[in-house]
Each structure stands twice: as C-alpha cells, then as structure tokens.
C-alpha cells in the first residue's frame, strides 16, 4: 500500500573551487596583514581618520549671548501680556500694538533682555514658520467700525395745518427736508433689536425738530421694517383685504415717503440689514424715494365700506370697496387715489421695489443674508523687527505703513438661527416691559407700528482665530525686543483684540554664500 523510501543512487558533485572574482580585503588591506602592522603595499581604499571633535558652528547655528551655538530647531514666543513687558514698554499700548521680549531668560531683567540679540548664522538664508492666535470681543454695533451711524433725510418743517386724507394726493404744503445723523447705542444685538433701535432713533429725530415745526406723525418718512406689505393683496381692487398687513417678518426693509432717503455711504448698517450694492466698488450708497419705483405699498381695505353677505364670508361687492384712509387715532395712511388705476399709499418699500423687474432698486441693490458681523473685513499682522519685508513692501516701522507678514479674516462671525413664534416672544416681551411703548410708539398705525421679528434671525459671535501663516524670510539679527502690530483694513490697531500670541520656528532655507 505504501512505497518504501529508497536512498539516492548517486550524489551530485560539489561546485568547482577556484579563485574568487572579488578581492578579499579588510579595511583596504589583504586579510593576511595583521591589524595595526604596516602594510607591505598601498591600500586600495583611503579611510580618513575618525572625527573626534564636534563642530564649533555651522550654517544652521543660532547664537545667543556667550552660550554655545544652538544647532537644533528652536522657537520664538510672542506674548502680549507679559508682566515685565507691561511695566516696562506697554504702559500705553494694547493687545494689537505692543512690544514684547523674546528672550525669556529669568536671570535678565526686561531692560537687559531688550538689549540682547539673537544671531542667526549669516551664511544661510533663514525662514520662520509663523503661527498666530488672536481672540477678539468685537460687538456688531460700534463707532470704530462705522456700524452705529446712518444718515437719513426726513421732513424737518412744513406749513401749519393738516392734510386732508380724502384729498387723494400726497403734497404737504411748504415741506422742507434735512439730512440727519441717526446714531444707535453701541452693543451686540440681534437683528430685530437693531431694527427697533433704528426706528426709535427716527422717532427721536422727529420729536427733536420736526414736531416743533408742524410735521405730523404721518409725515415721518423713514421706517425700517421686516414685512412683505403686499401679502393678501386683492388683484382686482388692489387693496389688502383683511384690513391689516400680515404681521410676520421675512427680510429687513426700508419704507420711504416722497423726499426722504437713507445714505449708507459711510455706514456698515446696510450689510447688517441685508441690503448691498450690486456694484460694490462704486462710490456712494444712497437709497432715495425715486429708486423705489414700483414698490408702492398697497392701501388697506376699509372693512366698514363693504358688507359680507355670503356664508363663507369671502365675497364682497367690488364697487363698494374703499381704501382705509387713516387709523383709529386719525393718523393718515397717505393714500393716493388721483392719477392711479388702483388706490395705493405714498409709502414705497425697498423690498417690494426690489421684486419689481427692471426697477432702479433691483438694478442698483442686491438682497443678501444679513451679516450681523457688520461686514468687517480682514485682519493684518505685522512683525517689522522679526521678518524682512515681503515683496511689494519696504522696511518701515510706522504704525500704518508696517509691512504685512500675515493676514486672515476678522474672527467675528454671523450665526443664523431659527426661532419659532418670534412674534409671540416679542409680544410677551413688550408686555413685561415697564415702558410698553418703548419700541411700539404707534400700535394703531399699520405702517408705523413695531416691525415683527423674523423666525430666521442672526446674531454676532467672536471665536478665536488660530492660523498657520506659512514660512517667511527672517532677519539674521533679531533684537530681544520685538514689535507686534495687528491692524484692520484701514491699517489701524484694533482695540477689540484682547489676546494675541504667536510663535516663530526658524529654519534654514538656503545658503547665502553658495550659488
């Protein structure tokens, strides 16, 4: 069943032995030469003597004081609030414009450390890997960033005597208009709070001058709102059939009367309101009444002029429909019936005009998401004593002319959130305020009443910005006292920076002597 194993009948011959094709050498000598004895012949290979002394310096050496050169990678640390620097150099400085010592030897006082230098071997071209970390506490409404002021054109004077609401025209006698600077308090607000403060500022301007010069409440010609005022507009009568505008916020809006305007030329408030220029680099940004063609706010239906006689209470006699001319307090809605096909108010809405094709508002402006950060741009870092000036700059230590070595977006962000039933929250808030008319001065007037908040709203938030800025050319001689400067788009130190740290890690980029 199994086969037995049999031994091989023949054994293969061994390989032929002969001289090796390669010479047998040990350290360049034949193997028969004793180690340490003089060779009978010259060695085939030259073996240099072993180096027993370490180098005293090199192209990557870093010298500091009288210590031995350091040839390992090191780091320089820049800190904005060192106690020794505060007492010595930064009494009148801030976190965006300060001087700091990069020599942290505890045996040296700040004055001595500032006179020391760190030498990078001048036979090499050095670069430093820069990493910055900045923390800010910037509000979205501030005078520094021009987000607390806007210019408005309002009626400042008119002839005494009211305007007949039944006249069907809007022509206040002897009306004079004037530009005002509307300023709101600095702070960090939500979008609906900014709109409330703007409207309250309009009322204050009216009480300050217009009221004393025969200007009526119905002549207040600038209103910031959030509603689509043409919702539920009847296509036949042109009237808003419920007799009231839909109280729901959608997007910030500007409502104007003839002769009134809003100027955003030197203000960032347009960005907070989501109203931007379609050509952002053009000069000036003014929204006038004439720009809002096609945006007339429809008049309200006077419910007392019609009689609902059907079961579902939806059918009315069109011939009997009349516009509502004034509110319960007698404040006119400035309804125009002369020269128009359908009754409409003299008020014009930017939001309605924007959605009218080929209107000046649509051609000049752009509806955007409200930027609660105020559209603040970039943040520039300058370290004139550490890095050589990049191409396009020249060496300068002046505050507004320092060469820029790093940049990043300002770490202030717009955060969008959804708040359901925001109008109910507003009503509850107004009910708990001691001054119930703080932001709702004219609750009976459908135009001038408080604007409803939006369910999709925004807030401003500051978050730390940690940025790896890359490798930049270093100077070969670094003084112990270094200047750090953080500026805005206009090259001004930013007062809202309250923590700044940076690290620089030097390394050799190339040789400055070998070509």
Curated annotation (Swiss-Prot):
Compositionally biased tracts (Pro residues): 9-22
Keyword vocabulary terms for this entry: Capsid protein, Host nucleus, Host-virus interaction, Late protein, T=25 icosahedral capsid protein, Viral attachment to host cell, Viral penetration into host cytoplasm, Virion, Virus endocytosis by host, Virus entry into host cell
Keyword Membrane in annotation: no
Gene Ontology molecular-function annotations: structural molecule activity
Region of interest (Disordered), ranges: 1-25
Keyword Membrane: no
Highest taxon above the source species: Viruses
A single GO cellular-component term on record: host cell nucleus
One Pfam family named in its UniProt record: Adeno_Penton_B
Induction: Expressed in the late phase of the viral replicative cycle.
Cell compartments where the protein resides: Virion; Host nucleus
One Gene Ontology biological process: virion attachment to host cell
Principal cellular location given in the protein's record: virion
Gene3D superfamilies to which the protein is assigned, alphabetical: adenovirus 2 penton base, domain 2, Penton protein, domain 1
Membership in a protein family: Belongs to the adenoviridae penton family.
Role this protein plays: Major capsid protein that self-associates to form penton base pentamers, each in the shape of a pentagon, situated at the 12 vertices of the pseudo T=25 capsid. Involved in virus secondary attachment to host cell after initial attachment by the fiber protein, and in endocytosis of virions. As the virus enters the host cell, penton proteins are shed concomitant with virion acidification in the endosome.
Assembly mode: Interacts with the fiber protein (via N-terminal tail region). Interacts with the capsid vertex protein; this interaction binds the penton base to neighboring peripentonal hexons.
Additional information: All late proteins expressed from the major late promoter are produced by alternative splicing and alternative polyadenylation of the same gene giving rise to non-overlapping ORFs. A leader sequence is present in the N-terminus of all these mRNAs and is recognized by the viral shutoff protein to provide expression although conventional translation via ribosome scanning from the cap has been shut off in the host cell.
The protein, known as: Penton protein
Organism: Fowl adenovirus A serotype 1 (strain CELO / Phelps)
Name of the gene encoding the protein in the UniProt record: L2
């Amino acid at each position: 069943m199994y086969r037995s194993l049999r031994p091989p009948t023949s054994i293969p011959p061994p390989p032929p032995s002969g001289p090796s094709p390669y010479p047998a050498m040990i350290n360049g000598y034949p193997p028969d030469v004793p180690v340490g004895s003089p060779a009978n012949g010259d060695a085939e290979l030259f073996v240099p003597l072993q180096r027993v002394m370490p180098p005293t310096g090199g192209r990557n050496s870093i010298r500091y004081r009288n210590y031995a050169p350091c040839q390992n990678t090191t780091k320089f640390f820049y800190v904005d609030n060192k106690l020794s620097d505060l007492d010595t150099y930064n009494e009148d400085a801030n976190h965006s414009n300060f001087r700091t010592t990069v020599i942290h030897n505890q045996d040296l006082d700040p004055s001595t450390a500032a006179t020391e230098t760190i030498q990078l071997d001048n036979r090499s071209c050095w670069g430093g890997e820069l990493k910055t970390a900045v923390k800010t506490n910037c509000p979205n409404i501030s005078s520094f960033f021009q987000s607390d002021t806007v210019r408005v054109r309002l009626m400042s004077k008119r002839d005494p005597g009211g305007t007949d609401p039944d006249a069907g025209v809007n022509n206040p006698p002897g009306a004079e208009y004037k530009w005002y600077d509307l300023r709101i308090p600095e702070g960090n607000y939500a979008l609906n709070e900014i709109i409330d403060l703007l409207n309250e500022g309009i009322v204050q301007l009216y009480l300050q001058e217009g009221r004393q010069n025969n200007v009526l409440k119905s002549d207040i010609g600038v209103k910031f709102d959030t509603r689509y005022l043409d919702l539920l507009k009847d296509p036949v009568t042109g009237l808003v059939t419920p007799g009231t505008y839909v109280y729901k916020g959608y997007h910030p809006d500007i409502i104007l009367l003839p002769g009134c305007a809003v100027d955003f030329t030197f203000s960032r408030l347009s960005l907070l309101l989501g109203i931007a220029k379609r050509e952002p680099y053009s000069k000036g940004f003014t929204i006038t009444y004439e720009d809002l063609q096609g945006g007339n706010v429809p008049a309200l239906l006077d419910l007392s002029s019609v009689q609902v006689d059907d079961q579902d209470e939806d059918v009315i006699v069109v011939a009997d429909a009349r516009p509502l001319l004034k509110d319960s307090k007698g404040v006119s809605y400035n309804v125009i019936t002369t020269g128009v096909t359908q009754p409409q108010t003299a008020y014009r809405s930017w939001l309605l005009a924007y959605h009218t094709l080929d209107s000046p508002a649509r051609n000049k402006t752009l509806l955007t998401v409200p930027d609660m950060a105020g559209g603040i741009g970039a943040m520039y870092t300058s370290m004139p004593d550490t890095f050589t000036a990049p191409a396009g700059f020249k060496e300068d230590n002046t505050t507004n002319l320092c060469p820029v070595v790093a940049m990043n977006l300002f770490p202030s962000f717009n955060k969008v959130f959804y708040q359901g039933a925001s109008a109910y929250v507003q009503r509850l808030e107004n009910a708990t305020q001691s001054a119930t008319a703080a932001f709702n001065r004219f609750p009976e007037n459908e135009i001038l009443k408080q604007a409803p908040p939006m369910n999709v709203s925004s807030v401003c938030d500051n978050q730390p910005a940690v940025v790896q800025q890359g490798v930049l050319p270093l100077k070969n001689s670094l003084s112990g006292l270094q200047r750090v400067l953080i500026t805005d788009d206009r090259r001004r130190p930013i007062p809202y920076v309250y923590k700044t740290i940076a690290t620089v890690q030097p390394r050799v980029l190339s040789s400055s002597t070998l070509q």
